[in-house]
Amino acid sequence: MELISTINLLTIVLLLFVVSKIWKACWILLLRPLMLSKRFKKQGISGPKYKILYGNLSEIKKMKKEADLCVLDPNSNDIFPRVFPQYHQWMSQYGDTFLFWTGTKPTIYISNHELAKQVLSSKFGFTIIPVKRPEVFILFGKGLSFIQGDDWIRHRRILNPAFSMDRLKAMTQPMGDCTLRIFEEWRKQRRNGEVLIKIEISKEFHKLTADIIATTAFGSSYAEGIELCRSQTELEKYYISSLTNVFIPGTQYLPTPTNLKLWELHKKVKNSIKRIIDSRLKSKCKTYGYGDDLLGVMLTAAKSNEYERKMRMDEIIEECKNFYYAGQGTTSILLTWTTMLLSLHQGWQEKLREEVFNECGKDKIPDTDTFSKLKLMNMVLMESLRLYGPVIKISREATQDMKVGHLEIPKGTSIIIPLLKMHRDKAIWGEDAEQFNPLRFENGISQATIHPNALLPFSIGPRACIAKNFAMVEAKTVLTMILQQFQLSLSPEYKHTPVDHFDLFPQYGLPVMLHPLG
C-alpha cells in the first residue's frame, strides 16, 4: 500500500512537472506573443504576423537572399531597400513604427529621431540586448560592448585614458608609418609599364586598420596583428551565417563541424592575444611600467588593489578581442565607403587634395593640429558617415516596462533603431537626403539639420563609442596620406552591393584604380 502511495505521489509530481513545462512552452511560444501583439495593436502598432517558434526569421532570410542578388547603380545612395529589405517592406505596410518577431522575441522598430534619442540617452530602463548566442562572445569578446552595470562602469573608467586626446596625438606617427608600409605593398603590385594599380581596397583597409590597432593599442608586430585579424575574419563569417537561424540552447556544446571550427578559431585568437600579453609582461619597464597604450592601461589595472580600478586577466583577454575586432572594422568600413564616394565625385577629391597640399604638403605625415585645419575633409567624412556609416542599426532591450513618448514598451521587448534609414530621412535632412553633399556640414553637425542630434554614427548617450575620436584620427591620417600620393577612381568591375554584415560592407568588395602622383 505504501509503495502504491509513493508511486502515485511520484506520478502526480511528474505530471505537475510535465504540465508546468507544457504551460511554460505554450506561454513562450503562443500565449505571450498573442498577448503582446494585442497590447501593441491597442497603441496603433501592428506588423507581420507572428509564426510559432520562428517568428519572422524565415521571412527575413528569404527577403535578404533576394535582395543580395540586386546590383545598384554606383551613383545611387538609395541603399536601404537592399541592405534591410525586411524593414523597407514592413515600413511600407505598417508605417514608421512596427512590431516584428525574432523567434519568440518581440521587437519594435523605431525610426523617429526624438523617440530614438530618448531610448539611447536613457541611463535606466534600456540596455544592450542580452547575448544568448555563444558565437557572439567568441567573435567580439565579452568586453565593453556587451557588459553592463557596475562592470561596464568599471571598465569604461579604466579604459578612458587610453583614448584621451593626448594619447591620440602620439598615435598619428605610428598610424602614418603603418600607412606608408601598405603603400609600398600597393606599389609592388604595379606591373611593368602600367601606370595604374588595381586593388581591392576594402581588404587592404581591413589589413591596414588591423596593423594600426595592433601597433597603437597593443604594441604588437605586424605579423601578430594580421594573424589575429585573419582568425577573427573567419569567425565573423560563421557569426553572420547564423543570424537568421533559430538558436537552440545547448547546441553550442555539441561537436558539430561548425562548432569544431569555431572552437579551433577561438583557440587561435586567444593564443594570439596571450602571446601579445606575455610579451608585454616580460618587457615591463621600471620607468614607464606597462606603457600608456590600451594594453598597458589594462595590465596596470590588473595590478591595482582597488576594485574600481582593477581588471582580471580574463577580462583583459575579452577586451583585447573586443577592441581588436571593433578597432579594425569601424575605420576600415568608413575608409572604404569614403574612397568609393571620392572616386565617384572627382571634383570633391580634387578639392580635398588641394586642401591637404595647402595644410600638410605632399609628403608629410599629418598630426592632430593639421586635422583641425582640414575643414573640407571633415565635411566629407561626416557625409560619408551619414550615407554609409559602419553602424547601420542600434539594438536595445527594455529591462522594465517603459514609456517612450506615446509608446508603452513592455519589459523584455527589443528595440531596433535604424540609423541607415534615419540618416536618409528627408523630413530631417532635406529633399537631397539621398545625395552626396558635404556642404550640408559647412557650419558643423548641429547646424546641418533641424534636429541637433540627427547624425548618430557613434551612437549617443552613456554607451556612445569610447573610441570614436581614435577612429576619426585614424581615418583622417590614412585619407590624407592617400590623397597626397594617389588619384582614386573606381574599377569598371565594381558592383554597388552594400550589405549588412554586422557593419555596412561591400558584398563583392571595392576594386579601385590607384594612379600614383609625382
From Swiss-Prot:
One of its GO terms (molecular function) is iron ion binding. Its main location: membrane. Pfam families: p450. The chain crosses the membrane at residues 3-23. PANTHER family: CYTOCHROME P450 709B3 (PTHR24282:SF125), CYTOCHROME P450 FAMILY MEMBER (PTHR24282). Belongs to the cytochrome P450 family. Plays a role in abscisic acid (ABA) and salt stress response. May regulate the salt stress response independently of well-characterized pathways. Does not function as cytokinin hydroxylase in yeast heterologous system. This is Cytochrome P450 709B3. It comes from Arabidopsis thaliana (Mouse-ear cress). The lineage of its organism: Eukaryota, Viridiplantae, Streptophyta, Embryophyta, Tracheophyta. The gene is CYP709B3.
